[in-house]
Amino acid sequence: VPGCENIELIEMASRLGVRETRHIKGQYKLTTEDILDRKHFEDAICTFAYAIDIHNSEGGGATFHQVNDYYTIPFRCLVPEKIENLLVAGRCISGTSGAAASYRVIPCCIATGQAAGTAAALALGEGCEAGDVPTEKLRETLTRQGAVIKD
């Protein structure tokens, strides 16, 4: 594939159903505490409330923390710290393993994907880097598209 000549496969799962994957180092790292404290960010791109369920990697049992209210995911979690003009979505956004145990599910992957795609389109229109899109404009556009972003 052109442009991918230097890509190296570091690791892959031995079976389907892997819950924990790699996460980028983003402009902000979402933490378990952010989720349990129901933190709301000014640059929020989605609202979410899935429980934190950490499955034992050795098999049998899980740690479960109910999320009693919603939290938000900031746009900065989609923006890599050192790579310009790239956005990520889904399980690989910037966060701790504990936080990922909540945001790794499909509805959140869809919401972060919508935010990343919308931000990329806005960046083209604004003539700026993807990570420099005005977050208020991004939030307004996502809301017009039907995204739920609570303050």
Each model region followed by its residue ranges:
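Flavin (FAD/FMN)-binding glycine-rich loop and adjacent Rossmann-like elements that form
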Residues: 1-151
